[in-house]
Amino acid sequence: MSEPDKPSQANIDKMWAYARKYAEKSGTSLHPDVGVTETVVEGLARHIEQVGRPLCPCNFYPDPQAEAKLRRWICACDEMQKWKYCHCLLFVSPDGLPITEHLPEDHEGRAAYGLVKDPHPDKGRATARVLERQKAEGPRD
């Protein structure tokens, strides 16, 4: 990455702090290859500067501003919130594989990595837990 494209150290530091905190909260690990983690963290920091939000750097967006407004790929993305699956490999199992246990059977992540168990099923999956609770409570009047 050339120096002019490098995000500010403040945004890099902000995203490192976020990544560490979210990994702890979600019961995941940061990728054991620090180079992978650094690349993703810098990509998130770069998107903060470009679109004002930490948009997932592992996707191509024809219109990053429009994608940021949709919020589905803001870190932690919808897939992480619902299935605890990070296709960027930022939030992974201790051995560096993405957690696939909660993915639908036909999801590309399950096909690519097989079944990778969730080391801490009691943590993370915030969106999935809300949906499960609402389903258990039944319809509201």
Locate each region found by the language model.
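Intrinsic disorder/low-complexity segments
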Residues: 139-140
